[in-house]
Amino acid sequence: MVYQCMIKSSSRTLAIALLVSAGLPVLSLAQAETDYEARLIEAKGEVTVFTADEPEGVPGGADMPLLPGDKVKTGEDGSAEIALSGEHGISLRPRSELTLSNLRRADSELSLALGSLLAKVQSLAGGLFRVRTPSAVAAVRGTEFGVEIDEADPEQTLVGVFDEGKVTVSGADGAEETLKSNQETVVRRGSRPMPAYQLRRLARHRSAMRGFRKRAGLMRKEWRAMTPEQRQAKRREMLPKLKLLRQQRLQKAQELREKARDKKPVRAPRADQQKMERRKQAIRDRLRGKGN
């Protein structure tokens, strides 16, 4: 028994040493037990993941392990779904930007810089789950909720609760407003949250939330946890492939631009230009006639 434990310990030490030599961050066992395991479950359309190793970003890939500090950005047609240890789910909507600031179970935090997200958070026993925007902080212990930075007015954040549960919303001065089922609030930068009112502006996300609820349930059922070594190995395997894919896409886009430029049609003279040319020609003809 002791011999088997020694073998396991040696194998784990060797795996960590290989990761360190490759220049990759290593998750300790203690960290793995106290942190959520974040994973990009689905990426549709334009989704880019920015990491410490790839600051220019790589295309988002399904089942890609994510680490604290990673940023996920969606384009005009993009959407992404992120799982935290198979317990909680985040749906990132188009034109959004989310950073996994902190994945500690006791006090996790996501930072939304642009756009909107929907979240399905299971009941937390003593832990706290927060979403921070430039103007507000939404703290939950288990519920279905949405957060949106107003596209027309980025200084304003909307927070709403869809299902049963509570979300505590605070502004810059620390003043709090608690939302219950079917309620929302608005927070302007530097101001306190408005008193809770009936879900209105975020109500348009209700059908999307219902669909995500089903996928989150399936995600929990199919979730297979990975060890820190497996996550690092998976990430090390995926990043070079995704980087190559980004380069191929950039090259293809450049070729398409050049092709479109080469095929740019010669603009035909407008009718008024043609009329002016005829008049000029008539004048030239008359002048030549007088000269003769």
Feature-to-residue mapping (PLM):
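Short regulatory "switch" loops immediately downstream of catalytic or recognition motifs
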Residues: 1, 48-52, 148-150
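C-terminal interaction modules
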Residues: 2-15, 19, 25-35, 56-61, ...
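N-terminal domain-start segments of secreted/luminal proteins
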Residues: 29-73, 79-83
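Conserved short histidine dyad/triad with adjacent acidic residue
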Residues: 32, 55, 92-96, 139-151
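Short, small-residue-rich packing micro-motifs
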Residues: 45, 66, 72-138, 160-169
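Surface loops and adjacent helix of pleckstrin homology
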Residues: 52, 77, 85-87, 95, ...
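Short, surface-exposed linear segments at secondary-structure transitions and domain or protein termini
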Residues: 66-72, 99-103, 147-151, 184-195
